[in-house]
């Protein structure tokens, strides 16, 4: 399993829609980059200037919305993940 460091979070992407509302099938090049994902692992938190560690506000299992071009895409054991900083997370869904 991937274990992120510091204030980083590993998410599994929620796949973009394959069809439009009217039923048109979209090719991969026309799909919007996903901005939703499920948190699968979180780092230990960020360290403040005084050395204190601050825990992350998200937890494994949270469904999140993140910045469109944030993070680094990685493939691990056949699954696509995105590793991003907590500051790139815009909201938790639900």
Curated annotation (Swiss-Prot):
One of its GO terms (biological process) is chaperone cofactor-dependent protein refolding. GO terms for cellular component: cytoplasm. GO terms for molecular function: ATP binding; metal ion binding; protein folding chaperone; protein-folding chaperone binding; unfolded protein binding. Pfam families: Cpn10. The keyword Cytoplasm applies. It is found in: Cytoplasm. Keywords: Chaperone, Cytoplasm. Disulfide bonds: none annotated. InterPro entries: Chaperonin_GroES, Chaperonin_GroES_sf, Chaprnonin_Cpn10_CS, GroES-like_sf. Signal peptide: none annotated. Heptamer of 7 subunits arranged in a ring. Interacts with the chaperonin GroEL. Together with the chaperonin GroEL, plays an essential role in assisting protein folding. The GroEL-GroES system forms a nano-cage that allows encapsulation of the non-native substrate proteins and provides a physical environment optimized to promote and accelerate protein folding. GroES binds to the apical surface of the GroEL ring, thereby capping the opening of the GroEL channel. Belongs to the GroES chaperonin family. This is Co-chaperonin GroES. The gene is groES.
